[in-house]
Curated annotation (Swiss-Prot):
It catalyses: adenosine(37) in tRNA1(Val) + S-adenosyl-L-methionine = N(6)-methyladenosine(37) in tRNA1(Val) + S-adenosyl-L-homocysteine + H(+). Its EC number is 2.1.1.223. Belongs to the methyltransferase superfamily. tRNA (adenine-N(6)-)-methyltransferase family. Keywords: Cytoplasm, Methyltransferase, S-adenosyl-L-methionine, Transferase, tRNA processing. The keyword tRNA processing applies. One of its GO terms (molecular function) is tRNA (adenine-N6)-methyltransferase activity. GO terms for biological process: methylation; tRNA processing. PANTHER family: TRNA1(VAL) (ADENINE(37)-N6)-METHYLTRANSFERASE. It comes from Shewanella amazonensis (strain ATCC BAA-1098 / SB2B). It is an enzyme of class 2 (transferase). It is found in: Cytoplasm. Specifically methylates the adenine in position 37 of tRNA(1)(Val) (anticodon cmo5UAC). This is tRNA1(Val) (adenine(37)-N6)-methyltransferase.
Length: 233
């Protein structure tokens, strides 16, 4: 079970959200240059923490509330080439004691997607996908609390969630530094956004990434972004 990458394997059995293209894109795209301490916020199976460990030398903290996902994290971290560099905290990130006193130069987060709508019948998946447990305002409060002054938080969101997320950013004095619209196929409307956030006002250029071309093959940009991770690239 799970998904094998070039440098590590992720067992995501029982996790609320399995390995996804969204998470791989985020983990490969985030600018970790100069990162001194990295947080994987809502780690799930630990994929983002593992990708960060492959890409930089910084110590990495992963926090996950779901016990099944946290168990998968432990196994995945232990089996990876970097077991001594990734620390797992099994706790609710909104609990003041969970990350007390910790500050990070980079925060990675693939947050819950749905502001409204029915919850899944599976509690783990519902928790992973629904913002009822970690809304955008709570997420942005965590970013302001635990991000260093010059730090960056990188996230992936559905396009339709952008307005609600921007409202939370503005409320807490955060701004977008980089914004990439992601389309599944060249020429199609974007479905996801890759965002880099920091303190201050918005300051970014419009960028676009297509995952596949019209023939169904990965685009050159997608291949360049993920070639260090996907086995067949």
């Amino acid at each position: 079970m799970g998904f094998s990458f070039k440098a590590f394997h992720v067992d995501d059995f029982g996790c609320g959200m399995p390995v996804s293209t969204d998470a791989v894109l985020l983990g490969a795209w985030a600018n970790l240059d100069g990162a001194d301490a990295v947080l994987d916020l809502g780690a799930g199976s630990g994929l983002l923490a593992l990708m960060a460990a492959q890409r930089c030398k910084a110590p990495i903290t992963a926090i996950e509330i779901d016990p099944v996902a946290a168990s998968a994290c432990r196994s995945n971290f232990s089996a990876s080439p970097w077991p001594d560099r990734i620390n797992l905290i099994e706790a609710d990130a909104t609990d003041a004691e969970a990350l007390a006193g910790k500050v990070f130069t980079h925060i990675l987060c693939n947050p819950p997607y749905f502001e409204t709508g029915p919850l899944s019948e599976k509690p783990g998946r519902a928790q992973a996908r629904h913002t009822g447990s970690l809304g955008f305002l709570a997420l942005c409060k965590l970013i302001t609390t635990h991000l260093s002054t010059e730090g960056i938080a990188s996230l992936v969101l559905p396009v339709e969630s952008e307005q609600a997320f921007r409202q939370a950013l503005t409320h807490l004095g955060l701004g977008i530094r980089q914004r990439v619209e992601v389309s599944t196929v060249e020429g199609k409307a974007p479905r996801r956004l890759l965002l880099a956030v920091s303190q201050g006002e918005d300051s970014y250029q419009h960028e676009h990434l297509a995952i596949r071309d019209v023939h169904g093959c990965y685009t050159e940009a997608m291949t360049a972004l993920t070639r260090d991770f996907y086995l067949k690239l």
